[in-house]
Amino acid sequence: MEIDLMKHIQKTKFIFVTGGVYSSLGKGVSASSIGRILVELGYSVAMQKLDPYLNIDPTYLSPLQHGEVFVTKDGKEADLDLGTYERFINADLNKYASVTSGKIYYEILTKERENGFDGKTVQTIPHVTSAVIDYIKKIKDSLKTDFIIVEIGGTIGDIESLPFIEAISQFKTIYGVNNVMFIHCSPLIYIEKVGELKTKPTQHSVKTLRSLGINLDLLLLRTNQKLDEVTIKKLAWSCGLDIDMIFAAYDVESVYLLPNVLFEQGIHKTILDFFSLPLKNDNINSWIDFTDKITTFKKHNLVIGLVGKYVELPDAYKSVLASLELAAIELNIDLKIKYIQPQNLNENNINEELKKINGIVIPSIAGSIKGWPGALLAASYARKNNIPFLAVGTGVNIGIGEFINNVLKLPIEFINLGNGDFSFLKDAFVKNEIENYRIGEYCSNIQANTITSQIYLKQNQLNERHRHHFEFNNHYINNYFLNQNWKIGAISVDNNYIDVLEYTKNHFYVLTIFNPEYTSKPSKANPYFINLLKMSLKIKES
């Protein structure tokens, strides 16, 4: 790595966000909230996640351990936090926005096996740290925004994250101290019996950061208690910060309210002053208009059933839930989600379990066959009772399988992947032999006189993100479905692939082989989720 002490002012400013004391602190939402404020003030923002785990990416991580796999526009399988980033800053990120230790080490070791280091000893410093810095530069060069906010995964003090911490310490020297800000998120522990906020864990976390070469520029405290002046002064003194560099990320009713909380404290002024940047706009009124819809009295209420293999961890369906939430906010609906484990559904309890459900969503499902009978029962209940139904991604198997089983009376067979799991139904789906894996954004032609044409008003095409190896078998669908009250809602622009199927006897029974949840944004929830709720409400109140 060449050390170029660039002390002059850089156009792109960097904010690095670390977390202390324990994981699942909410630093991703905190970082995203800062990003949203900067966007509202007229600055362009990109975000990046540096994750210390040794998986190359989250493709094969269990959803029960790590939550959903998010997919970027350019086809990167990424940490679910990227979905949070995109929704908050209202921007599409790219393949450089998600980097893991596993990816860094894999690339270094591959290069070493090819003698790419000319016989040099490969070490954490400088080779690993330089690789991290290269990825930080790549997102800057590819997205060219005013700000880049980088979240460091894990907790300060974890051995896994040390190369990342060293890398960002070096980066500040390389890029210029006036162009890089360090923010640390840390909890204040409230002892209810004595009514006291304990600051010692945060003090130790900051001390650990200092020992690793990171001097804080701003401290963001997670707490559900109002910060008092004594606590702020105590932390300022012990952490070597001015009191105006300490802010509180209070617990809020909705994560989308956190930008409001931070803006009211003036965090934007501190950040802009640090970088010597002007205050282009003195309000975040457009965001407040959106969040006012969250806190206002709801005129309507709905219950949507989410049927999925991993409902024990809702984060496994993070973007689906976010899409439903954002759609409900737009429509002024008090939305309740009923999580339904398909393995618990059977012929004896299906009516009781679903009788109060106004709509059903089946997200991507993969893995063992155990939950199939219950999932098919849910799809059958929706089809027979005209319950609005949306199956996305690999969840289209359920809508197709139910019809094959109950209407066509054909046997259900699965494509054997050789590991006890299934991916798609045999015959109804075929492996994509041309592209192998459709992942990322693809364009589809909307077909006339369909539900899709009604919800994508004045559009002839749609752009959605895919993540699948298999496609609808066009021949099978043409022979068995299109003469049985099914329509093609959208087809790929090259006419090779069916992307949307719709059952026309129901008001809203839609199967999308792409994952529409990935493109929902505040004030612009994906149309499929908007119309699922619209139709659910219409049927309920009719």
UniProtKB/Swiss-Prot annotation:
Mg(2+) binds at D81, E151. ATP binds at S24, L25, G26, K27, G28, V29, D81. The keyword Repeat does not apply. InterPro entries: Class_I_gatase-like, CTP_synthase, CTP_synthase_N, GATASE, GATase1_CTP_Synthase, P-loop_NTPase. It comes from Ureaplasma parvum serovar 3 (strain ATCC 700970). Keywords: ATP-binding, Glutamine amidotransferase, Ligase, Magnesium, Metal-binding, Nucleotide-binding, Pyrimidine biosynthesis. Homotetramer. GO terms for molecular function: ATP binding; CTP synthase activity; glutaminase activity; identical protein binding; metal ion binding. It comes from the Bacteria. Belongs to the CTP synthase family. Allosterically activated by GTP, when glutamine is the substrate; GTP has no effect on the reaction when ammonia is the substrate. The allosteric effector GTP functions by stabilizing the protein conformation that binds the tetrahedral intermediate(s) formed during glutamine hydrolysis. Inhibited by the product CTP, via allosteric rather than competitive inhibition. Pathway: Pyrimidine metabolism; CTP biosynthesis via de novo pathway; CTP from UDP: step 2/2. Gene3D superfamilies: 3.40.50.880, P-loop containing nucleotide triphosphate hydrolases. Its EC number is 6.3.4.2. Residues 1-277 are annotated as: Amidoligase domain. UTP binds at S23, K198, T199, K200, P201, T202, Q203, K234. This is Putative CTP synthase. CTPSs have evolved a hybrid strategy for distinguishing between UTP and CTP. The overlapping regions of the product feedback inhibitory and substrate sites recognize a common feature in both compounds, the triphosphate moiety. To differentiate isosteric substrate and product pyrimidine rings, an additional pocket far from the expected kinase/ligase catalytic site, specifically recognizes the cytosine and ribose portions of the product inhibitor. Catalyzes the ATP-dependent amination of UTP to CTP with either L-glutamine or ammonia as the source of nitrogen. Regulates intracellular CTP levels through interactions with the four ribonucleotide triphosphates. The active site is at E517. CTP binds at S23, D158, I159, E160, K198, T199, K200, P201, T202, Q203, K234. Residues 310-542 form the Glutamine amidotransferase type-1 domain.
